[in-house]
Amino acid sequence: MGGKLSKKKKGYNVNDEKAKDKDKKAEGAGTEEEGTPKENEAQAAAETPEVKEGKEEKPEKDAQDTTKPEDKEGEKDAEAAKEDAPKAEPEPTEGAEGKPEPPKDAEQEPAAASGPSTGGDAPKASEAEAAEPAAPTKDDKSKEGGDATKTEAPAAPAAQETKSDGAPASDSKPSSTEAAPSSKETPAATEAPSSTPKAQAPAAPADEVKPAETPAANSDQTVAVKE
């Protein structure tokens, strides 16, 4: 009995050793298999933060891209405003050039009519000069007076009397003398604000009413000289 038992024990022992070896091999394989997933998991865990960082960088880039168009739009708006500013600046000059032109026509029309009635011409002249912006200063008027007296030598007395009052004569002024002040008026109109013409406008009619007070003999003299 004991021998059988011993054999059995040995057999069991042999089997147990084989089974243990198998178990060890299986456990080793299992640990290796378990180790590889762990390594894979570790690599995946290491990759995930990098991927997250890459994803975070992408939104930052997108945010920068979105801000860049906004900046570009802002720059475009600024450039457009700058372009509009120079465009808006010449407008007063154009307006100033356009405004002095009607006075020229108004002054030439009385010349065509030979201006017998100084009273009718005075209001026209007052309206014409009132329409002019911050325009001819006293120096410009004196220059106009000097040029006109040179060109209108025969009618010097009447011209001097009327021009000494600071108003235009009933006779037509040469277009050359008017063109020069008009060019001078454009910078004055751009530099001077709109308040200056309003301030000077009331003073102009007061000076311009004086030609109407001058005797009509002056106008008769001018007509006689022209004839």
Curated annotation (Swiss-Prot):
Residues the record lists as Phosphothreonine modifications: T31, T36, T196
GO molecular function, one term: transcription corepressor activity
InterPro entries: BASP1 (IPR008408)
Lipid-modified residues, N-myristoyl glycine kind: G2
Covalent cross-link Glycyl lysine isopeptide (Lys-Gly) (interchain with G-Cter in SUMO2) as placed by the record, residue numbers: K25, K87, K99, K163
Keyword list, A-Z: Cell membrane, Cell projection, Isopeptide bond, Lipoprotein, Membrane, Myristate, Phosphoprotein, Ubl conjugation
Region (Disordered): 1-227
Biased composition (Basic and acidic residues): 15-27, 49-107, 137-150
Domain of life: Eukaryota
Localization: Cell membrane; Cell projection, Growth cone
Membrane topology listed for this record: Lipid-anchor
GO biological process: negative regulation of DNA-templated transcription; protein homooligomerization; supramolecular fiber organization
Basic residues bias: start-end ranges: 1-11
Low complexity biased stretches: 151-161
Phosphoserine modified-residue sites: S164, S170, S172, S176, S195, S219
Major localisation: membrane
Tissue-level expression: Brain.
A GO CC annotation given for this chain: PML body
Bias (Polar residues) ranges: 172-185, 216-227
One Pfam short name: BASP1
Family under the similarity heading: Belongs to the BASP1 family.
The protein's name in its UniProt record: Brain acid soluble protein 1
Organism this protein belongs to: Bos taurus (Bovine)
Top-level taxonomy: Eukaryota, Metazoa, Chordata, Craniata, Vertebrata
